[in-house]
Amino acid sequence: MSVYGLQRLYIAGAHADATSGKTFDTFDPATGELLARVQQASADDVDRAVASAREGQREWAAMTAMQRSRILRRAVELLRERNDALAELEMRDTGKPIAETRAVDIVTGADVIEYYAGLATAIEGLQVPLRPESFVYTRREPLGVCAGIGAWNYPIQIACWKSAPALAAGNAMIFKPSEVTPLSALKLAEIYTEAGVPAGVFNVVQGDGSVGALLSAHPGIAKVSFTGGVETGKKVMSLAGASSLKEVTMELGGKSPLIVFDDADLDRAADIAVTANFFSAGQVCTNGTRVFVQQAVKDAFVERVLARVARIRAGKPSDPDTNFGPLASAAQLDKVLGYIDSGKAEGAKLLAGGARLVNDHFASGQYVAPTVFGDCRDDMRIVREEIFGPVMSILSFETEDEAIARANATDYGLAAGVVTENLSRAHRAIHRLEAGICWINTWGESPAEMPVGGYKQSGVGRENGITTLEHYTRIKSVQVELGRYQPVF
């Protein structure tokens, strides 16, 4: 028997049975316990979700921006009231420590909805004078029905990040969470309905990549926002373009560089590096997994990093003292262990970790020890490829130009950071780094006000910040003639 029982779809403001006859299971990654059996959507279910979204979107868009704003603010209140219960659900589904899910996942999701609720009334057009008797004005209008496809590392946060700007702009959204962590999106749907969002404006369809493909190719959907891996993102983008030239937002993978210069506060640098590699057991797309350290301070830096890694408290996610949990799935566990084996085989020096944790309460979970490799080279797989697990690669460099060139020598461009006390060098280096999200003397915070997205193959478009509303609206230009029309014939 499962903990949460049978989970269905959420369509037209209510839970709904799927018609596929298929289900999949979701497990607690810390214990292996069956959490729920989840119904998988069929093509007919996706059609049903699109039809209800169209109907709901017309009602939603007809409301005033202030009305939409008030409803979204009510959803924020409900999320915050239920923070602890939602955090426990997220802990069970993702394996994250309860201290993390209580402080981060629902909190940051609610913050983003609150942010866009405030911006809903600020969506406006322009007036452009042409001549005394003629002018142009523009309207920003909603796209219609949008699709959101989420990743398994931040399920409810991603659902909030994608739905908030969409709904604030007057759109509807059909959201597909990852089949690895499918539970919390259904709770968000219930909250939206309770807050007053019309039926159909936020639907949830469950399933694997085949359901994501149905959404990406559906002619009734105007936009797809996807978070996940690069190769899957390319497939989504191809389907979206080939079917109906949908607009897309892609937040994809990364292999982000963290550059520690020789004048850095090394205690600060070590704190940043450990956070940038081991928060959420390393399952964060922006993690700074390529740590470039100037040669003169490398040994002192490594010493500080290893001291901090030794203090990491791996344990049961429900223990409030735990700050390091399991990986989200057995498949991810196998992938990470494969990369660790590759690092060893290619000659990287194992400084910490490097194995699965199997003693005592770790035995039934998908735990990997926080792993640090030194003496890494740019051509190693652990340096070139996204691992999405708790594996830090330390590389040394001599000059600023060398560090920048090597940091940019990747197809990724999601995030980057520098640690230095030299203000001029900090900004100079950041301006040369090819990444969409950058940090100076810090790492990892992505507040609602900050546009998030990548360069190169790390993404298209942005999430969060004011500019994201541009990706959920379209511009209509209207010319008005006050004078006499001048005929051509």
From Swiss-Prot:
Q: Pfam families in the record, alphabetically? A: Aldedh
Molecular function GO labels:
betaine-aldehyde dehydrogenase (NAD+) activity; metal ion binding
Which keywords, in A-to-Z order, does the entry hold? Metal-binding, NAD, NADP, Oxidation, Oxidoreductase, Potassium
Q: Which residues carry this modification: Cysteine sulfenic acid (-SOH)?
A: 285
The chemistry this enzyme catalyses reads: betaine aldehyde + NAD(+) + H2O = glycine betaine + NADH + 2 H(+)
Q: What is its EC number?
A: 1.2.1.8
Q: Which InterPro entries match?
A: Ald_DH/histidinol_DH (IPR016161), Ald_DH_C (IPR016163), Ald_DH_CS_CYS (IPR016160), Ald_DH_CS_GLU (IPR029510), Ald_DH_N (IPR016162), Aldehyde_DH_dom (IPR015590), BADH (IPR011264)
For activity, the cofactor(s) needed are: K(+)
Site feature (Seems to be a necessary countercharge to the potassium cations) residues: 247
Ligand binding (NAD(+)) = 150-152, 176-179, 229-232, 253, 285, 386
Q: Which PANTHER family match?
A: ALDEHYDE DEHYDROGENASE-RELATED
* NCBIfam families in alphabetical order: BADH (TIGR01804), PRK13252.1 (NF009725)
What assembly does the database describe for this protein? Answer: Dimer of dimers.
Q: Which family does the record assign?
A: Belongs to the aldehyde dehydrogenase family.
* Name the record gives this protein: Betaine aldehyde dehydrogenase
Q: Which organism is it from?
A: Burkholderia mallei (strain ATCC 23344)
Give the encoding gene's name. betB
